[in-house]
Design a protein with these regions (language model features):
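Charged, amphipathic alpha-helical linker segments immediately N-terminal to NTP-binding catalytic cores
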Residues: 1-4
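Phosphate-binding/switch loop-helix module in NTP-utilizing enzymes
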Residues: 97-158
Length: 190
């Protein structure tokens, strides 16, 4: 019988969540944080990001939201988990709105690749992934394009050994989307 490969678990920093997850999230996994608007997806992502980010495992937060990262940070600073000392050191925020507005998913992927190569993060967050999906709908064959984008993103993040989180507004578990076919884990908020 072959020996099982041990998967390292990353503590989320969220009280009670690690116990539910069997000790934390699997390292190098590709995860989705989903739920309706206002349910706390971005706050949960930030709490996990600040808990996981370190000089050895930097975090990259790619935002496609309409609001600038500065406004988002202003609200997140109200929480105890927020650590101003990690900003632009262990935690980097990058705005992908310009690329998303082109509707070209290849352009969005190129920018993500460039940022990951430059910063070599151990943890990557894309918020809001639904904005990327909606931007990609301006292309001709949207389903094929989105499926290709998702597969490429999942393969690249895995090869770079980055634990990845896609944050998205989904209203029901049955919302059809290619993201569900590549996600290793799903955290559904209500």
């Amino acid at each position: 019988m072959t020996e099982k490969v041990k998967i390292n678990r990353l503590p989320t920093g969220v009280p009670g969540l690690d116990e539910v997850l069997g000790g934390g999230l699997p390292e190098f996994s590709f995860n989705l944080i989903a739920g309706p608007p206002g349910c706390g997806k971005t706050t949960l992502a930030h709490q996990m990001m600040f808990a996981l980010a370190s000089p050895e495992r930097p975090a990259l937060y790619l935002t496609v939201l309409g609001e600038p990262p500065l406004k988002m940070l202003r609200y997140q600073q109200q929480f105890d988990f927020f650590d101003d000392g990690k900003i632009n050191r262990s935690v980097r925020f990058v705005n992908l709105s310009d690329e998303a507005l082109t509707g070209n998913l290849d352009e969005v992927l190129r920018r993500i690749v460039a940022e990951v190569k430059e910063h070599t993060p151990g943890v990557v967050f894309v918020d809001s992934f639904r904005s990327v999906v909606l931007a990609g709908k301006t292309q001709g064959d949207q389903h094929h394009s989105l499926q290709h984008f998702m597969q490429q993103l999942a393969v690249l993040m895995t090869s770079w050994q980055a634990t990845t989180f896609l944050i998205g507004e989904y209203f029901t578990e049955t919302d059809a989307n290619p993201v569900f076919t590549v996600a290793d884990g799903l955290i559904w908020l209500r």
